[in-house]
Amino acid sequence: MMNLSAAANGRDEFPPYVVPSNAAAPPPSLLPTMEQQQESSIHREHHQLLGYNLEANSLALLPPSNAAAAHHHTTFAGGHSPHDILHFYTPPPSAASHYLAAAAGNPYSHLVSAPGTTFHQTSSSYYPPAAAAQAAPEYYFPTLVSSAEENMASFAATQLGLNLGYRTYFPPRGGYTYGHHPPRCQAEGCKADLSSAKRYHRRHKVCEHHSKAPVVVTAGGLHQRFCQQCSRFHLLDEFDDAKKSCRKRLADHNRRRRKSKPSDADAGDKKRAHANKAAAAKDKAESSSKNMDIGDGLGAQILGSALLSKEQDQTMDLGEVVKEAVDPKGKASMQQHYGFPFHSSSAGSCFPQTQAVSSDTTSNIGQVQEPSLGFHHQHHQHSNILQLGQAMFDLDFDH
């Protein structure tokens, strides 16, 4: 952008240049000639050296005035300062009317000065009054977009519904595009608007009143009723009394919902099967408990037998210890069995003694042995016989 404050200071430093009255006016044009472009580039470089900030396109957009053209030709010849290049001419009435018509529909027309207005009128709201009053060049901005194009763009935006982040490609809810009408009740003479009705009523195009009415006159003058199962109108002959569903669909509905009652024979068979199943489960439980009792008793019996046999073995080991007391002269000897003392005598009296010992031993064995265990009984009898044989052998050997 142009440095307006610098331009204003430049005008204060250098007096304005007066254009001679006999200067030939060049033909008006919107674009500068080649000579003017070369001279403007020289002046632009000079202004950049002096501290002015001019855009490259600022001179190309605004054509120079007659005074500026004369100034371009006399700047270097007369020695005047080149700072008066901001003078522009007022366009002809035809061009002014064209730009005024184009700027009429421009929303930013209040920022653009009309041809013939001063810089102070358009820049007073942006710059201080002192600086705006000192800058007096006249210029204008051409409208880049016409009002017709802008109106067309706004119309297209409203039709497309492009509203900055909102998906409005389709019309809003409740609205209908061109050629479409809101759903209405299909009953004869009923034009109820179903836009705000329930989705069910909008879908089947029936209002709430006619969906429950017993008789509805539809198109063609037919007396019908709305079926709640089929969601459409049927003739009155297809309904039973005041039912709201037709006969066919109501029968299907009842068959699905209701369950048939079982017969007496089926109930008896089911009861017997249940009783048999319960009895079998009970027998199985009793047999398992009985087997457990037998196993527990057998284990206890085996454990008791083992303990008893251990005690008997210890007793027999002690009873097998035989103490013999022999007389030094060899006349008499005495054998002592554990708990069974007897004296030796002649050979004739040996058998009764053996019989006495046998009877005593048998009685002792009967006292300590349990009669229910045959195996242990045979074992102890065999050991007793061996003990008796040993005693008889000792007696015979002594005599």
UniProtKB/Swiss-Prot annotation:
**SUPFAM superfamilies reported for this sequence:** SBT domain
**Pfam families attached to this UniProt entry:** SBP
- Give the residue interval(s) assigned to the motif Bipartite nuclear localization signal: 243-259
**Which keywords describe this protein according to UniProt?**
Developmental protein, Metal-binding, Nucleus, Zinc, Zinc-finger
Q: Name where it's found.
A: Nucleus
Cite the binding residues for Zn(2+) 1.
185, 190, 207, 210
Positions annotated to bind Zn(2+) 2: 227, 230, 234, 246
One GO term describing the cellular component: nucleus
* Biological function: Involved in the formation of ligules and auricles during leaf organogenesis.
Protein name, entry field: Protein LIGULELESS 1
**Organism per entry:** Zea mays (Maize)
Q: What is the lineage of its organism?
A: Eukaryota, Viridiplantae, Streptophyta, Embryophyta, Tracheophyta
